[in-house]
């Protein structure tokens, strides 16, 4: 059984249905790309998995029913989330941001700083003084400090300068190589996703319209479903 199994996921915003029986799985050590045009349900899927919005269907992680969790408590189940948009506490220092997210396990301040050495000299500075790229690195560091078994990255490279974007892709590649984390990625960078992901799922208007290995993600598929 895959650590994360999502079956027949549905979600609504008021009277409007946003997801229609979406299914996907993420195995331990696997990188899965969740793809689709803007507004097709990718972030809604992530929010549903992480108990940020109500959802129907079945969501299990390590055999446990995530829908039984209190809202916004995905970290307790072992899921680390970097949501769309950079998320940190601007009124806290970098170190305080990391400490606030900490849960027992191998990821701690030193291991996060090994991954993001550029934050080492900024530990005692307010997170509000960081650049956008540094804030995103801090957001990923905070997610890792929860010591997850599954890491979800929702548009983690969106709006960043090319060098910072590449640095984050390098970090994701390192996490894939050196850890047993399952990783669920949402990103528009087809080239980078194709280089790092094992499998992909494509959503269109809240419905899963394609799923397969990265090798099967042909130009015909991307043109039909992504307009690329």
List where the protein language model places each region.
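Glycine-rich phosphate-binding loops of nucleotide-dependent enzymes
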Residues: 2-228
């Amino acid at each position: 059984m895959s650590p994360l199994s999502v079956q027949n996921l549905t979600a609504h915003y008021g009277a409007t249905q946003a997801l229609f029986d979406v299914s996907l799985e993420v195995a331990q050590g696997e990188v899965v790309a969740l793809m689709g045009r803007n507004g097709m349900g990718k972030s809604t899927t992530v929010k549903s998995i992480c108990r940020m919005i109500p959802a129907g269907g079945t969501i299990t992680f390590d055999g446990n029913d995530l829908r039984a969790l209190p809202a916004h408590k995905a970290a307790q189940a072992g899921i680390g989330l970097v949501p769309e948009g950079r998320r940190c506490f601007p009124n806290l220092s970098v170190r305080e941001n990391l400490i606030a997210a900490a849960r027992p396990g191998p990821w701690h301040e030193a291991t996060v700083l090994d991954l993001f050495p550029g934050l080492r000299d900024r530990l005692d500075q307010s997170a509000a003084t960081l650049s956008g790229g540094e804030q995103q690195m801090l957001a990923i560091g905070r997610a890792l400090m929860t010591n997850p078994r599954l890491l979800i990255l929702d548009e983690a490279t969106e709006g960043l300068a090319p060098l910072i974007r590449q640095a984050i892709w390098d970090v994701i590649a390192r996490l894939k190589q050196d850890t047993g984390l399952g990783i669920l990625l949402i990103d528009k960078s087809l080239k980078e996703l194709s280089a790092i992901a094992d499998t992909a799922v494509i959503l269109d208007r809240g419905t899963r319209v394609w799923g397969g290995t990265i090798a099967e993600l042909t130009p015909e598929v991307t043109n039909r479903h992504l307009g690329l």
